């Protein structure tokens, strides 16, 4: 459902006539065949960013479903489940991916506070960082300097994944990105008449 004590601003939606635009690229459930047809599947490093004790791992992802890619079916593939839809807004038996858009959340404010503190001499980035980590079932960290900056940026990635922040964050930090290995190389789609990767993953 859409209830959360961490939401600061959430837009109103109501079935059947006042619904939001939806995002189904991560799931695309096919009820007739009981399979998922996602347009995007996270690379292995993305899944590995979440510890098993991190409550977000089994909220943001699922690997209990059958995934069909180019006519082939796979199991034990982690797919993004961050936008499964609110059953109260469904207009049929299966999900329509409808849920109320969350514009501002407390977690983002903690991350902004932590990142801002990194740029203030004597600023305390650890307190908001660890408050968020502990709220997600993780242990507090005790780091400083470059390690603290990395910890804050990694936590921002974990919390806000698949919400559209990543490219802006990388540009703001003047960082690039590296192509990495998929969960299963068989999931790579054919392009340019070849199954050979044009750029090796690292």
Predicted regions and their residues:
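Acidic/polar-rich alpha-helix caps and helix-coil junctions
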Residues: 1-25, 35-37, 50-202
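Short, cationic low-complexity segments
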Residues: 30-44
